[in-house]
Amino acid sequence: MMRKWLYSTNHKDIGTLYFMFGIWAGMVGTSLSLLIRAELGNPGSLIGDDQIYNTIVTAHAFIMIFFMVMPIMIGGFGNWLVPLMLGAPDMAFPRMNNMSFWLLPPSIMLLISSSIVENGAGTGWTVYPPLSSNIAHSGSSVDLAIFSLHLAGISSILGAVNFITTIINMRPNNMSLDQMPLFVWSVGITALLLLLSLPVLAGAITMLLTDRNLNTSFFDPAGGGDPILYQHLFWFFGHPEVYILILPGFGMISHIISQESGKKETFGCLGMIYAMMAIGLLGFVVWAHHMFTVGMDIDTRAYFTSATMIIAVPTGIKIFSWLATLHGTQINYSPSMLWSLGFVFLFTVGGLTGVILANSSIDVTLHDTYYVVAHFHYVLSMGAVFAIMGGFVHWYPLFTGLALNPYLLKIQFFTMFIGVNLTFFPQHFLGLAGMPRRYSDYPDTYTSWNIISSLGSYISLIATMLMLMIIWESLINKRIILFPLNMNSSIEWYQNLPPAEHSYNELPILSNF
């Protein structure tokens, strides 16, 4: 039993490990976010000073991004579904796949230890120098966080190489690239983004490490360095990263919507592929829109404003194609469909606030206020997380062969929907009123919206616990699925439920596409 899980080279077992790790990390990250909202629930300080507060904020961001969303979306859904959807017997490099997973537990341990030794890394997830220099953050906290990022980065790069190789080499004989399922495409593009952006982050944080410990001056003006260089390097990774977090979600939503609509494929399949490629490409040329306040040239700001707005075009193509897929169907409000509809609506809202922030002139005012927090939590907490939830309840019968309770799932969806909206909608108002980010306290003027926001976070907590209870109930009661209720336009539903340990002993052949 021990050997099965420690030395596994089976994509399904490794996918399950990723799910368990991601759910655990998600609970840690959620606890941290509740500490943040408890601190901000009333004026005055509750937990302590801004150092401990910012340490909590930093850990919350890193855990949610690197140990919850990425492991579940790419590691969990990617590992499980990509080989099944391609008709491949496993991933291209099964042992490397195992290593990708086992680099994550040491990585999260380093991250957690960074917040419990010395004063913690209170730098925000961006780890900007000079705040992250050895003067402002003496001690080993930031160094531990850097090593944690290195491990998580190596894990993701190895995973990316694995997915790219699998997708290029392990398709059925006569399946062309444009015939691949959209989820496989989305994971492939995500892997490419990871492969191109993570080495830049590794370079940036390695330079920061030597600045802190070996007396170099990459980011120290006293020695001829420039802290702005760090920001450029970080955001050259950081912006593709946010698309890495959402693209697999796009793929899952495409599958769920077409299946639940009873359509054989998504509307504008090829357009969806090109839209994802465009989003991936454009994601690399807009990074400095995170830096409108550092004093760039007017023409530079004009370029980054325009380029950022162009991303709205392929994103809009995706939104309208999903709506077109839904068109003319009698919508069946199943739990996975509810998550998808919630995703499309809330992701659009988050996207619109993004277009507002893309204007460099307006962003000077809104930068580092709660407006930005509201924007990215709409696309992450209601985009990425809704996609994860929708994908989970949609494919859970395939992964386990068991049924979840749909009635409880609907209650859970509406609880979560109310919770996240109540948490993050008021933050738009706080941002417009000028409440800055990353402070543990605020003037009394902002009290009312903060109380409402914190109330929403407690509702989300109840929803999260309800989800865990639903999964537990399903595993205890073991309502075994006799046959899938799905359209078999996606090949993964032709498996046994759950699939056999080795699903494709002979390779499938494509016919009548």
From Swiss-Prot:
Any single GO CC term annotated in Swiss-Prot or TrEMBL for this entry: respiratory chain complex IV
Transmembrane segments: 16-36, 62-82, 101-121, 144-164, 182-202, 233-253, 267-287, 304-324, 337-357, 384-404, 413-433, 451-471
Organism: Choristoneura pinus
Family statement drawn from the similarity comment of this UniProt entry: Belongs to the heme-copper respiratory oxidase family.
Residues annotated as binding Ca(2+): 39, 44
PANTHER family, per database record: CYTOCHROME C OXIDASE SUBUNIT 1
Record's subunit section: Component of the cytochrome c oxidase (complex IV, CIV), a multisubunit enzyme composed of a catalytic core of 3 subunits and several supernumerary subunits. The complex exists as a monomer or a dimer and forms supercomplexes (SCs) in the inner mitochondrial membrane with ubiquinol-cytochrome c oxidoreductase (cytochrome b-c1 complex, complex III, CIII).
GO biological process: electron transport coupled proton transport; mitochondrial electron transport, cytochrome c to oxygen
Identification of the protein by name: Cytochrome c oxidase subunit 1
Alphabetized GO MF terms: cytochrome-c oxidase activity; heme binding; metal ion binding
Gene: COI
Subcellular compartments: Mitochondrion inner membrane
UniProt keyword annotation of Metal-binding present: yes
Entry binding sites for Fe(II)-heme a: 60, 377
Residue sites binding heme a3 per the record: 375
Domain of life: Eukaryota
Reaction equations catalysed: 4 Fe(II)-[cytochrome c] + O2 + 8 H(+)(in) = 4 Fe(III)-[cytochrome c] + 2 H2O + 4 H(+)(out)
Known EC number: 7.1.1.9
Binding locations of Mg(2+): 367-368
Signal peptide: none
InterPro entries with a match to the protein in the record: Cyt_c_oxase-like_su1_dom, Cyt_c_oxase-like_su1_sf, Cyt_C_Oxase_1, Cyt_c_Oxase_su1_BS, Cyt_c_oxase_su1_dom
Cofactor binding summary note: Binds 2 heme A groups non-covalently per subunit.
Matches recorded under CDD domains: Cyt_c_Oxidase_I (cd01663)
Keyword annotations: Calcium, Copper, Electron transport, Heme, Iron, Magnesium, Membrane, Metal-binding, Mitochondrion, Mitochondrion inner membrane, Respiratory chain, Translocase, Transmembrane, Transmembrane helix, Transport
Lipid bilayer topology: Multi-pass membrane protein
Biological role: Component of the cytochrome c oxidase, the last enzyme in the mitochondrial electron transport chain which drives oxidative phosphorylation. The respiratory chain contains 3 multisubunit complexes succinate dehydrogenase (complex II, CII), ubiquinol-cytochrome c oxidoreductase (cytochrome b-c1 complex, complex III, CIII) and cytochrome c oxidase (complex IV, CIV), that cooperate to transfer electrons derived from NADH and succinate to molecular oxygen, creating an electrochemical gradient over the inner membrane that drives transmembrane transport and the ATP synthase.
SUPFAM superfamilies, per database record: Cytochrome c oxidase subunit I-like (SSF81442)
Binding positions for Cu cation per the UniProt entry: 239, 289-290
